[in-house]
Each structure stands twice: as structure tokens, then as C-alpha cells.
Amino acid sequence: MPTPLLTVRNLRVSFSREGKWNEAVHGIDLDVLAGRTLGLVGESGSGKSVSSLAVMRLLNGKVSRIAADSIQIEGKEIRDFSEDQMADVRGKCISMIFQEPMTSLNPVYKCGFQVSEMILQHEEVSKTEAKHRVINLFKQVMLPRPEAIYDSYPHELSGGQKQRVMIAMAIACNPKLLIADEPTTALDVTVQLEILKLLRKLQAETGMGMIFITHDLGVVAEIADDVAVMHNGEILERGTVQQILNHPQHPYTQGLLACRPPMDVRLKRLPIVKEFLDGQWQGGKEQILRDLQITEAGRKAHLEQLYSKTPLLKVENLKTWYPLRKGVFSRVYDHVKAVDDVSLEVYEGETLGLVGESGCGKTTLGRSILRLAEPTGGKVWFDGIEVTALKGQALRDFRKQAQIVFQDPYSSLNPRITIGEAIAEPMLVHDIQKDKKKCRAMVCDLLEQVGLHAEHYDRYPHEFSGGQRQRICIARALAVNPRLVICDESVSALDVSVQAQVLNLLNRLKEERNLTYIFISHDLSVVRFMSDRVLVMYNGKPVEMNDADELFEHPQNDYTKKLIAALPGIHPKA
């Protein structure tokens, strides 16, 4: 066997909290070979990122403690390297791409300067030579107009372009090992596929080894050769990507695979990881299909009943345009057509999926329906009432009937008030319950309904995980007993295991409360699981609308076909 690029033996990482040391990583072993990719998979908090940061010595030494029997790069022990020696290792031997490029790139410096800085730090070259190399790197990572991007600030680039700049920075000094920490999590499926293809291409050209950190086994299938599955700071299972994805042995791995919404069958609900750990699904996929699959006849009967009613929501030729201005007098010279002539109907009890890439107008459409963004033209009717004509108290009354769950639960919640007060606030604003004791009892009941507990009432948002915060936002949206709920990318920031729990919760609440959903997402597998019908948007316009199963199995529009083709599968790369 060839000497691994990276060898880690018995790595242990502890963090200090309130004077006590708590071990977060419990003695893991890692091997990464040249030209191969190790997929490091697990939920948030499993220790994936901490392990890689510990190898690179990037953890805060005041609050962390790293111990290992051995950490070797190409057979050279680096465990006892000084900080100066480690600074030389970083960038030249090991480099890292982080999850969020906007926070990794300095907003006050131009992109080209930041990548040049990496080269100048590690190599003795002139600034002119460094600039020339950066422009070539930008070409290598397939950035459009590399000279222009060299002189651009991070905020002027799209998410995918910023991630390409980060990749260029990471490979600037030809590292032997690249650590990619969730580099595609926040990206659209089409951009995600491009980044994965780019990383594979760069690996083929340079022969570098790679550690690819993710919570999504579908992404691992696209890029990894070997897989290690982490949970609570331990590696539970390891093997080739084919072994792990096709024949998972550990219940946790089986659960991670199963909680991803399937594209080939319809399920009443998604299995969750805890059920696998509790031994509930020992019969595997056959048992899941037997217990949870929705039959074609069952779905047909459901849809016939659904569409026999009159639509709850009607949107007719809706437009939301934003003016572009220039000159001293701010003359309007054009418009950004965020929503451009969209018509649709949503029936009571239906879930309409709304999909498209970032910037396609799906969020603006949702906000325009609720009048959170003012439409430029067109009409919206809700239960026979023209929403676009409402003002004052009538508009406030409509907002009791229609609510929204936003993408980022942390920024949706006021950090200064308890979550109980946050959920009670809309009840008080809309005069649903003025008695504080009764209001508190109603909030506690809502907390129980969304899978939290009454004792959580007096806690603050920062005390909860991402999945719990999203449950709080759902509870707040339900506080006014709405009939329509718009879910705007409400699970996109969550691990697949937590995502499954929230999707199951949304469907359960829909049945119990007879809710109607507009479900906005760029994740097509989630949209198919949730939706009865799907509308695909591109550049503000609707390009295809159909029954969800029909649209995914027989897409008509080329853009829809492109979105579906970009979906990461759970079948490993050849």
C-alpha cells in the first residue's frame, strides 16, 4: 500500500467550558491517499470540522486541547511542529475551503489581492508574477472574466463565484491535500454540481488528496472514493463509497441514507435517524416501503378530492419590478423583473412547490402574495377577496390568514426576547388572546405541537439548535391559526436528519390544522416529497407547472430537465 498523504492516529480534541474539559472527538483514525477523496460524513456537532481544524492546528489554543498518537503528512510527523512550521504547512501542504465563502473572504479587499496574498506569503515571487498566476487560477476554476473578478470585491460576486475564488485560493500553492468543509451546502443544485465537477477536475490534474466534509450522502456519492461516517466524535463506519452507500452496516449510516427524500417513491413520512438507532427499521428498505409507501391509487384519490374544491389562492399576471436608476437625478433606465407575469392557483389543503435557482424570483413571489413586497401589477385573491386592493385593518386581517416561515430562523427571532414571548407576540398584535395567562398556555401548547416543551418558554434563541429554532419559527407562524403558510427555504440550512424531522412536522401540522402550503426551495428532492404540484421559475417567469410526480418523471422544459439532472444521487460515482 502506498504511503498515505495524511495519517492520523487516535486524534482527541477537548474544549474547555466553565472550567471543565469536555472531549468532542474521541480517538479517531484517518488515512487519505494521493488522488483519492475521503468523504467525512455526519450531522452538525459530530466532530467532522473540528477534526480537520485540529489537524491544521486552527483551533483556539486557549479553549481547546489537541492530542494524538500521530499526525503525519507524507510520512513526516507534524504533531510537535512549531507555529512557524505549521504556517508553512498550511497552504503549501494542506489547504482548506470553508463552508461560507462570504465570511471567509475579507469584504474590504478585492478578490485578486486576497489570492495573491496567499502566493506571496508562501513563495518568493514578484507582485506582477503573483497577479499573473491568480488570473490563471481564476481561469483554471472557470470563473468568467477573470481579469474583472481580480478587481472585484466579494459582495459583487454570486455565491458560486465566491466559492470558486475560495477554491482558487486553496489551490494557489499546489497543496498535496485539500480539505473541503461543506463547500456546496449553501449553493443551488446546478452550481453545486459545477463545483463538484471542478474539484474532481482539479484533483485529476494535480493528483492531490481530498477530505470532503458534508452531512449529505448524496453529495458524497458524487465525489468520494472512500467514506468515514462520524457521530458524537467517533467514526462509526468506514469503507469505499460503494460499500457504505450500497451496503451500510451501522444503523446510523442506514438512517442518514433513509432520511433523504427519495426520488423514486412517495412516502407518508420520512424515516428518521433515531428510529434506526432504536432498531425500528431492521427490515431495511423493504420494511420502509411496506409501512410508509403511498400507493398510486391512494395519491390519485387524494388529488381528486383536493382539486374538487375551489382554489383558496389565485394569482393573476403578478409582476414585481424594481427600478434601476442612474445619474444625478436618479433617472429610471431599466427594471429588475423579479416576478414577471406569474399566474397560479393553490387549492385548500394543497402543497404547491416553488423551485428555481437563487435569483429566479421565487422568494419575491411569496413575499408579493403576502404584500410584504408591493406588486407592480397583477392581482392576488385569497378566499375570494382581492388581496392587492386591501389596506389598513383589512390587510392586517388577511395576514392572520397567511403567514411565512423564513429561511434563517436565527435572524427571524429577536435575540433579546424569550422564544415564548416571540411566539406570543403575533397573538397580542392580532388581538387573538389578551389574557397573558391564557396566552402563555396557548404558546406552551404550540411548543408541544412542534416537538418542543413548555419549559422552553423562558429560554432565548441562542440556547437552541438550528432545527429547534426552525420549529420555534413554525410555532410562531401557527400562533394566529393561519390557513396558508409560505415556507421559504425553511429547511435548506438544516442537516438531512434534522430536515427530515422538520418536513415530517410540517406534513403532520398540515393534516391536523388543514393548512395550505406554498413550499419554496432549490432542493428538488425535498420539493417532490412535500408537493402535490410544482411550479418551476426562471428569471422571474414561470417555465413549467405540473403534478409533482409527472414533472419529475417527464419534465418538458429544458431548464427543468437541467435542474433534475443536477440532483446529487445516492448511487456512487463509477
Per-segment meaning from a language model:
Residues G91, H155, A172-C173, H462, ...:
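Conserved signature/switch motifs of ABC ATPase nucleotide-binding domains
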Residues S152-L157, Q161, Y460-F464, Q468:
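Conserved ABC ATPase signature
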